[in-house]
């Protein structure tokens, strides 16, 4: 890996085009390096993982709405892209929007956390849609996805967005554009222009994840994927981008991030170096913000222990979660969001409330992507009482481990201190989720398949499940990427909410 220093350059400075970060990323994307076998296997795992959460979310309103947007844009010339659940082909950028929304809706797919947050599986829907549009095969798709993960993960390692209240999809637009560039074997300059356009059109504020969180949380990465496809299309037609997009005097760093004098360090693979960043990412066993994965497992375990000791949760006086800066301020009481304690809050808000999540997991000693968020569950009187006794505090040691570059030390956990009214104190901690590569039950192919089977049950026919799993595990051999789509029976889709007509 090569560490690249990135800073603002005034327009009067000499700053060669080849030194622009977008150009360096484009060179990585254009590098025809082979994808290693373990990387390919993990990409296949994540294709399966995305399909799992699409199956679980397909009947939800935001996903049904996004699907309706794609359905009014059918393509009949043999091109286009597939939409999860549907037969036929649709405009690729709108298929990417529909599929991306389904992937993100339940907060249930993969994650990478460093200086910034990310869900790099969001790269897959736009890259797959572009591949289907262009008639590419599985080997090309895998190369494109490897690039998408590589670029997003390394931007996340080196450039914090949230401290300036910029949403993390600003790293996704460029990474998806770069991945599509790899997929299509585009030249460096075309990829460079596409990256610049994709970044320019996907910078947005973090209000999408603050306060009363709406369905836009699911649409945001899907929209970035749509923008990346359109950016590539324009660049292929010879259109340019604002440049230098990151380093310009009126660019992203100068006015949206840390300003004129700040230097970021972005690691990127050297020429000929394999793209392996996907191996540093991790998926979710539970449908909730990643920083709550270990606390959910901790709560389940502590719930069992408290019950075995005869301790009653109704006698709890307080619960304090000692955790990292990010966890405290994003999903904890450091956010100062009263909505995180509101039983009438949206599901999107509750899955960003570690207080709600820990209370329910502690009581139920389990977590379910639907039942744990049901309105009747959130309104349970004893849950509300327990929920309001929970707070978070930042612990410098957890913050240090969160940002550690040592995989053996990096952690996203918490220490829970439960104090009962009689003075009894019970505490425990968990550094990483059970499903984490270093956890109690690390996810491998078997677990990805089980997650798919579990979430697809009652939605996807068993025959279609078998067909998809066979195709997905042969992605590198596929010539027709429509095999990676899943079609649902009409009676299943009929259960989706009725969506009002839009403009189109």
Swiss-Prot record:
Catalysed reaction equations from the record: (2S,3S)-2-methylcitrate = 2-methyl-cis-aconitate + H2O; citrate = D-threo-isocitrate
Coiled-coil stretches: none
Pfam families: MmgE_PrpD_C (PF19305), MmgE_PrpD_N (PF03972)
Record flagged with keyword Lyase: yes
Listed InterPro entries: 2-Methylcitrate_Dehydratase (IPR053420), MmgE/PrpD_sf (IPR036148), MmgE/PrpD_sf_1 (IPR042183), MmgE/PrpD_sf_2 (IPR042188), MmgE_PrpD (IPR005656), MmgE_PrpD_C (IPR045337), MmgE_PrpD_N (IPR045336)
GO biological process: propionate metabolic process, methylcitrate cycle; tricarboxylic acid cycle
Superkingdom in the source lineage: Bacteria
Induction remark: By propionate.
Pathway entry: Organic acid metabolism; propanoate degradation; Carbohydrate metabolism; tricarboxylic acid cycle; isocitrate from oxaloacetate: step 1/2
Molecular-function GO terms, alphabetical: 2-methylcitrate dehydratase activity; aconitate hydratase activity
UniProt EC number: 4.2.1.79, 4.2.1.3
Residues spanning the signal sequence: none
Assigned keywords, A-Z: Lyase, Tricarboxylic acid cycle
Other known facts: The prpD2B2C2 operon is essential for growth on propionate as sole carbon source.
Subunit: Monomer.
Role according to the record: Involved in the catabolism of short chain fatty acids (SCFA) via the 2-methylcitrate cycle I (propionate degradation route). Catalyzes the dehydration of 2-methylcitrate (2-MC) to yield the cis isomer 2-methyl-aconitate. Could also catalyze the dehydration of citrate and the hydration of cis-aconitate.
PANTHER family: 2-METHYLCITRATE DEHYDRATASE, 2-METHYLCITRATE DEHYDRATASE-RELATED
Family classification: Belongs to the PrpD family.
Protein name: 2-methylcitrate dehydratase 2
Source organism of this protein record: Corynebacterium glutamicum (strain ATCC 13032 / DSM 20300 / JCM 1318 / BCRC 11384 / CCUG 27702 / LMG 3730 / NBRC 12168 / NCIMB 10025 / NRRL B-2784 / 534)
């Amino acid at each position: 890996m090569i560490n690249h220093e990135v800073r603002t350059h005034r327009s009067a400075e000499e700053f060669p085009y080849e030194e622009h970060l977008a150009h360096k990323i484009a060179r990585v994307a254009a590098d025809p390096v082979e994808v290693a076998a373990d990387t390919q296997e993990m990409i296949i795992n994540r294709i399966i993982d995305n399909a799992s959460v699409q199956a679980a979310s397909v009947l939800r309103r935001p996903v049904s709405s996004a699907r309706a947007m794609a359905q009014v844009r059918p393509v009949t010339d043999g091109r286009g892209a597939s939409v999860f659940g549907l037969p036929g082909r649709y405009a690729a950028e709108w298929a990417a929007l529909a599929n991306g929304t389904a992937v993100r809706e339940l907060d249930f797919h993969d994650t990478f956390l460093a200086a910034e947050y990310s869900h790099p599986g969001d790269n897959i829907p736009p890259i797959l849609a572009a591949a289907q549009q262009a008639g590419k095969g599985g080997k090309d798709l895998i190369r494109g996805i490897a690039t998408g993960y590589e670029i997003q993960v390394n931007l996340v390692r080196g450039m914090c967005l949230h401290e300036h209240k910029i949403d993390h999809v600003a790293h996704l637009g460029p990474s998806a554009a770069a991945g599509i560039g790899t997929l299509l074997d585009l030249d460096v300059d075309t990829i460079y222009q596409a990256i610049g356009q994709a970044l320019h059109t996907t910078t947005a504020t973090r209000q999408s994840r603050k306060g009363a969180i709406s369905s836009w949380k699911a649409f945001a990465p899907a929209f970035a994927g749509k923008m990346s496809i359109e950016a590539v299309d324009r660049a292929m037609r010879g259109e340019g981008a604002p440049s230098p997009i990151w380093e310009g005097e009126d660019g992203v760093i100068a006015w949206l991030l840390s300003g004129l004098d700040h230097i970021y360090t972005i690691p990127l693979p050297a020429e000929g170096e394999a793209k392996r960043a996907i191996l540093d990412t991790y998926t979710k066993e539970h449908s909730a913000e990643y920083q709550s994965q270990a606390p959910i497992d901790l709560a389940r375990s502590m719930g069992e222990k408290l019950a075995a000791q005869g301790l009653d949760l109704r006698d709890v006086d307080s619960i304090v979660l000692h955790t990292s800066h990010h966890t405290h301020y994003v999903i904890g009481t450091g956010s100062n969001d009263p909505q995180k304690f509101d039983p009438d809050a949206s599901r999107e808000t509750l899955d960003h409330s570690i207080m709600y999540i820990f209370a329910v997991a502690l009581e139920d000693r389990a977590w379910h992507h639907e039942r744990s968020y049901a309105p009747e569950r959130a309104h349970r009187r004893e849950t509300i009482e327990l929920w309001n006794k929970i707070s978070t505090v930042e612990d410098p040691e957890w913050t240090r481990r969160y940002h550690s570059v040592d995989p053996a030390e990096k952690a996203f956990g918490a220490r829970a201190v439960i104090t009962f009214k009689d003075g009894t104190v019970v505490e425990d901690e968990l550094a990483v989720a059970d499903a984490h590569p270093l956890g109690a039950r690390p996810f491998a192919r078997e677990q990805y398949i089980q997650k798919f089977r579990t979430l697809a049950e009652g939605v996807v026919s068993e025959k279609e499940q078998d067909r998809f799993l066979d195709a997905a595990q042969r992605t590198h051999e596929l010539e027709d990427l429509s095999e990676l789509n899943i079609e649902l029976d009409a009676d299943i889709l009929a259960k989706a909410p009725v969506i009002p007509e839009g403009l189109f």
